[in-house]
Amino acid sequence: MSVFNYQKDQQGIVTITMDMTGPVNAMNAEYKVAMHDAVNRLEQEQGLVGVILASAKRVFFAGADLKDLVGATPDHAEDIYRDTQRIKHDMRRLEKLPVPVVAAINGAALGGGYELSLACNRRIAVNHRAVKIGLPECSLGLFPAGGGIVRLTHLIGVQAALDIILGSKQMTPEKALAVGMIDQLVETLDDLIPAAKRWLIDVESQADAARQPWDRKGHKVAGGGINTPKNAQYAAVAPTMLHQKTRGLLPNATAAMDIAFQASMLDVDTALRIESREFVKVVTGAVAKNMITTFFFQLNQINAGASRPQGVAKNPTRKLGVLGAGMMGQGIAYVAAMAGIQVVLKDMTLAAAEKGKAYTIALLAKQTSRGRLDAAKAEVIADLIKPTICDTDLAGCDLIIEAVFENIALKNTITQSTEQYLSDDGHWGSNTSTLPITQLAEASAKPENFIGIHFFSPVDKMPLIEIIAGEKTSDATLAKAFDFAQQIGKTPIVVNDSLGFFTSRTFSTYLDEGAKLLVEGVHPVKIENLAKATGMAVGPLQVQDETSLELSRKVSETWAAMGIVDKWGDGETQRRMIKDMITDNGRGGRHHGGGYYDYHADGSKSIWPGLFELYYDDSVEVVDRDIQDRLMFRQVIETLKCYQTGVLRSVADGNIGSIMGIGAPAHTGGFIQFVNSYGFSAFIQRCDELSAAYGARFNCPEIVKQRAASGELFA
């Protein structure tokens, strides 16, 4: 029995309803057989008026089966090319039928699903928030290879197509209609098939209705080919702009742009072959494997609750207390209110608490002005936040999160004075970024209900929450924090307690190695540029300015008071930087009058000249590769140590946490996947070289040597 239900009605319209094995329709081996057979049958039909391609699933079509792609190697190149061309051949046969074909899009049509709809003459979608239209492949180290680049370029033009493809955009039906990705909307699912049939009947006598635009005589690409004056200007600057964004580290993005340029000048069939050829190169490369592994399989694993205690009932947060209305506290209040949670925002003064709420009001106003949010809805959201100075307003909170300064005495005082207002089943979270949760929990009457909930700044933009389980944290508390993170739309990773946990501990090695290079006499601009060349979003000096040298000073003082100085390595460089930059020169960071950089009134910045006087030595020679590897390997090694000692509970948490929380280069798939891709033997050898040249901080963790001996990848 075919997984494509084939029915022809009395009007001569065939409806093919895709209902494949499994939860979604996917472009796998089953699809290839079913589509090939369906097209064969359609080509032999008599009295055919039109075809409707529909879905029996909630999703129209999910695209390629990534399990078939993640293991691709250069040895599979010929098979992949042949298979890709076979899929495209049947799509071409579908769109070259003598009658028009309609894609009846009832749910998400992403990736291969949207590409399949592009092989239809008309795309009609249900106007519902669950329906998403787009081509997200570039976010997985791939590009649309089922004809998506070629057809979309012809349909809406080079620039518009690349904006969607390179941005991995997923659009609402209304937006997709506005940009020309689909042709028609219906308001309900019941309207979908009737609307498709009406259109087929209406155009029955129109010969061009059955011809794709690119197959019509005299066809020109929307907006013209890449050699038209407007597009030629775009083509002259776009590759450079793309390289600035990707640092040349995402070969899929470069290939996608090149294919679109060529597609605008070539016939469709030639362009489709080029698309297949370039796809083989990309899918068999390391970047695609890294990104598919992490951004698809491991991210889905996390979002599905792999780190959440099993057997604990869902426990959504109803009333949240946020203590401290500063940068972090106001951000937490905003994202919670956006999720419909009642928030009590407490600070030492009412003015400070109200200023914290004003942050939410300002963000809501921006969304309203851009048409993204109804004014009445914005008012409802803002009203969920109650600014206060009264502890009693916290009564009945089922979750309280403190977001005050990194001072253990202050945090302990706040815990003891306010946790009594929690509901009977309430839980306490600390937003500390460095202090051990087990030690903070000693101030609590119920340490089993105490947990770390580490947000990242800015809270409204950063997608990650790091949940830290203390030694006494219960499964119920861990589940509560996990559920809260997902409730506010964040991706949660779960780690065990440790000074600095995972993200702050690993991130600090990036700052430290940047500072070490500076102290050694390396030119600061060279440090910054080579850091970005590895794929890091910003250099270590700039990011230290953003996070604040002054904050580092306070943390250092707190750690000294706790008797844990240098627990994770030599802190001498940091102490020198604090003395040189803050004590001697008053350079505390961007928000403290300047740090490594000077910040100018026009918004620009430049290296503070004092750095050259303090540190730069033009006789120092550190080769570029060593600088890049020192910055990268410090972070990778620290991540491996966290995994080896049990701070990290899973490889997935390490990879996703390093990318979303630390800024690990996307092309690596995260700091643990980096080692899989680099190769164990090569990684061990490079660690030995760096260790011999620069010190024991580059010693290879034992766990890598164990994996090298067993041949087992980190997974």
Model-found features: residue ranges?
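Conserved CoA-thioester-binding segment of acyl-CoA-metabolizing enzymes
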Residues: 1-56, 78, 83, 89-92
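N-terminal glycine-rich phosphate-binding loop for ADP-containing cofactors
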Residues: 4-9, 18-19, 71-86, 92, ...
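Short, active-site-adjacent cap segments at secondary-structure transitions
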Residues: 58-62, 110-111, 435-436
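Gly/Ser-rich catalytic serine loop of serine hydrolases
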Residues: 103-113
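Short glycine-rich donor-binding/catalytic loop of glycosyltransferases
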Residues: 127-132
